[in-house]
Amino acid sequence: MSEHVYNLVKKHHSVRKFKNKPLSEDVVKKLVEAGQSASTSSFLQAYSIIGIDDEKIKENLREVSGQPYVVENGYLFVFVIDYYRHHLVDQHAETDMENTYGSTEGLLVGAIDAALVAENIAVTAEDMGYGIVFLGSLRNDVERVREILDLPDYVFPVFGMAVGEPADDENGAAKPRLPFDHVFHHNKYHADKETQYAQMADYDQTISEYYDQRTNGNRKETWSQQIEMFLGNKARLDMLEQLQKSGLIQR
């Protein structure tokens, strides 16, 4: 049994520094086709992919993201929940379909579809020798992103992905993930607090040692400290409002 795919995904890490080499149209097409082969709930295909090589558009999106690799990459993808085409079908339907695609369930379906497509693209790109980094930072200003990309109603930007050849001095590495026994629950969820705390304490030590080694002692924070800092920062609190402005979560 080949373990090629297993070994490939186990090596995954975010690449944030790329060579100045644009992806060819053929490569972009293959990546998108690989993405389209992902599973999709009820065959709704409630997503679209926006490919961006226009430097001005990239720069505008960089201002939203704050990350240089939004511009400095081989190619930029933006993944959106897309019910615009379903809305067009709805205009000639005998039933009110908006009750479904404008619901919270509709949001979940579209977001999951987009994520599955993106992961297919990520794995395919890495198999081709490219590096990738996901860009949730495009949600820093959803209204601006919708304006930049001319997104119609019922279309919502979920995240981006920068793709390209890793720079020669790119030295990223896979971060240790949560322990297998902490994320895999056999038959039912195991919520025993003592076990959970013990597993997280071990993981905190692993992450602290990882950062200490990677940064020559400049970073030593634990995973729990990172989570406290991130989740304690009340960011993007307008998301429900922005979703509703897009025509989603109406009920």
Please annotate each region the language model reported.
Residues 1-251:
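Acidic, surface-exposed loops and disordered segments
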